[in-house]
Amino acid sequence: MAKKSMIAKQKRTPKFKVQEYTRCERCGRPHSVIRKFKLCRICFRELAYKGQIPGVKKASW
């Protein structure tokens, strides 16, 4: 889990546009965030296995 101070800092509008970055909406993780779902890879995997993300299923070939 991310610190509350870092989550609050990220929500503020930055002075420059390039300072914006993605953060997982569920746990606050700043790295490996899937933009389409706004989730980090770990949270995405957990929710996908539970079937809570519509249209996502485990690949098999």
Swiss-Prot record:
Top-level taxonomic group: Bacteria
Chain sites annotated for binding Zn(2+): 24, 27, 40, 43
UniProt-recorded Gene Ontology molecular function terms: rRNA binding; structural constituent of ribosome; zinc ion binding
An individual GO BP term: translation
PROSITE patterns named in the record: RIBOSOMAL_S14
GO CC, one annotated term: small ribosomal subunit
Free-text cofactor note: Binds 1 zinc ion per subunit.
Swiss-Prot/TrEMBL cofactor(s): Zn(2+)
Keywords associated with the record: Metal-binding, Ribonucleoprotein, Ribosomal protein, RNA-binding, rRNA-binding, Zinc
Subunit structure: Part of the 30S ribosomal subunit. Contacts proteins S3 and S10.
Family membership: Belongs to the universal ribosomal protein uS14 family. Zinc-binding uS14 subfamily.
Functional summary from the UniProt entry: Binds 16S rRNA, required for the assembly of 30S particles and may also be responsible for determining the conformation of the 16S rRNA at the A site.
Protein name: Small ribosomal subunit protein uS14B
Species name: Bacillus licheniformis (strain ATCC 14580 / DSM 13 / JCM 2505 / CCUG 7422 / NBRC 12200 / NCIMB 9375 / NCTC 10341 / NRRL NRS-1264 / Gibson 46)
